[in-house]
Amino acid sequence: MPESMSFSLNQLNLQLLIPMCISLFGGIILLGVGVFNKTKSRDLYITISMLFVVLNLGFLFLEGNPIRQFGFFNLLLVDGISLLTQIIMLLATFVLLLFFMNQNNLPETQGAEFYALLLFSIAGFAFMASSQNLILILLGLETASLCLYALIALHNQKSAFEASIKYFIMGALATTFYAFGAMLLYAATGSVDIISIATFLHQQSYQPSILVFAGFVFLLCALGFKVTLVPFHSWGPDVYEGSNALLAAFIAIVPKIVTFAVIIRIFSVFIDSHSAFVEYTLYVIVVLTMTIPNLIALTQKDVKRMLAYSSISHSGFVLAAVLINTPQSHSVIFFYWFLFLFANIGAFGILWLSVDCKKNYQTQISHPFEKFSGMIKTNPTLAILLTLFMFALAGIPPFCVFWGKMYLMQSAISANYTILALIMAINSIIAGFYYLKLVIYIFAKEPYEIKDSQSSLELSSKFALSITAFVSVACLFMVQNLLEIIEKYILK
C-alpha cells in the first residue's frame, strides 16, 4: 500500500463514536419496531428510547475519560467539555421521556418516528459537541436541527406547522451565517480546525485581520440564533408556543447546552486575543440578552411564552460565563445549566400534565395564567411543585438556580467584571416578578374552572416530578461536590 494511503487504526480511535452510534442504532431500532408493531404501543417506544439513553449514559460514565482524546484523524475531540455536554443532554432526555409516559393522547407522541427523531437529534448534538472542526460541527448541528424541525411539525396542525417553518427559516439563516463565518476564518488562517486557528492567531501575536473579525461576527450571529441571544431571539417564544410543553423543554435545554459547548471552544480563541471589539461585542449582547427578555416576560399572558423568554434570559447569564473566560467560569456554565434543566423541565412537565386531551389542539398547547388560577384548591400537589419550580427558576435561595447565579456572580467579580455581576443581580430581581406572578395566580385567585381538575399521574410522571423537585431543593447539600466533579472534567 502506498505510504500516503497507510494509516493506523489508532488514528481513527473509533470508540469515540460509540455514543453517537448508540443513539443512531436506537433510532433505527425504533423505526423497525414501528413498522412491525401494529398496535402502536407508545410505552414500548418510550421504553426502548430510555434503554438506549441509559446505555449511552452508562458508557459515558464507565468509559468516559475527561483527558483529551482525538479521533477520526483529529477531527473529533472528546474531552471534559464534550462529556459533560453529553451527560447533561442525556439526563434531560431521560427525565423528559419519563414525562412522556404519562397518559396523554397527543397524536405526535404515539408513533415510533417521534422517539426515533429524538434519538437521531441526540446523535447529531453529540457529534457536534465532540468536534473541533468547524465543518463537522455544522454537520452535527444540521443533523440535529432537521430532526427538531420534523418533531415540531409532526402534529400537522396549523400552529405547530407555523412554529416549525419559523424554526426552519431561522435555522437556514443561521446555517448561512455559520458557513460564511467558517469560510472567512479559513480564508484568514488556512484551516477550519479550531486548534489550528488558535495556533495561527497565537503565532500572529493575536493581531487578527479584518477577515478574522468578520468571521467572528458571522459565527456569533449563527450561534446566537441557536441559543436565542438578543437580537437573534425572536423565533424562540413562537416555536415554544407552537410545540407541546415537553418538546419546548427539550428545545430550551439540549440544543443550547450543546451550542454553548461549541461557543466555549470557538469564542475562547477570540477572547484570548484580548480584542476590545470582541469583548465589548459580547458584553453588550450579554447585557441585552439578560435584560430585554426579562422585561418582555413581565408582559406575557401565557405561561409557556413567559418560560420561553425566561430561558432566553438564562442564556444571557451563561454567555456571561463565556465572556469571563476562566476555568472557573467554564465550570459554572455546566453547573448552572445542570441545575437549570431540572427546574425548567419540572415547570414544563407540569404544563404537559395540565393538558386536557379532550379539548382542541390550540387549547392543549396554550397555557394562559388564568388556567392556573386557584390551582392550590384544584390540584394542591402540582400547585406546590409548580411554585417550587418558579422559586428555583427565579433564583430564590436555597433553590437550585440560586447557586448557579451565585457562583457565576462570584466568577464575574473575581475576573473584575463587577458591573456585570451587578447587572446579573438586577435582572434576577426583575425575573422574580414574573415568576411570582404565576404563584399569585396559583394561591390568590379563584379557580378558573369550577370542576375538579385533579390529574391522573402515571408512576413515571411521579418519578420525574420527584427527581426534578429533589434536585431543585436538595442541591443545597450537594453544590460543592457537584462543582468539584465538574471542575475535574473542565480542568483536565
Swiss-Prot record:
Job of this protein: NDH-1 shuttles electrons from NADH, via FMN and iron-sulfur (Fe-S) centers, to quinones in the respiratory chain. The immediate electron acceptor for the enzyme in this species is believed to be ubiquinone. Couples the redox reaction to proton translocation (for every two electrons transferred, four hydrogen ions are translocated across the cytoplasmic membrane), and thus conserves the redox energy in a proton gradient.
Reactions performed catalytically: a quinone + NADH + 5 H(+)(in) = a quinol + NAD(+) + 4 H(+)(out)
KW Cell membrane (keyword) present: yes
Listed name of the protein: NADH-quinone oxidoreductase subunit N
GO molecular function: NADH dehydrogenase (ubiquinone) activity; NADH:ubiquinone reductase (non-electrogenic) activity; quinone binding
UniProt family annotation: Belongs to the complex I subunit 2 family.
Enzyme kind, highest EC tier: translocase
Entry keywords, A to Z: Cell inner membrane, Cell membrane, Membrane, NAD, Quinone, Translocase, Transmembrane, Transmembrane helix, Transport, Ubiquinone
Keyword NAD found: yes
Cellular component, GO annotation: plasma membrane
UniProt subunit comment: NDH-1 is composed of 14 different subunits. Subunits NuoA, H, J, K, L, M, N constitute the membrane sector of the complex.
A single GO BP: ATP synthesis coupled electron transport
Entry EC number(s): 7.1.1.-
Main location (coarse class): membrane
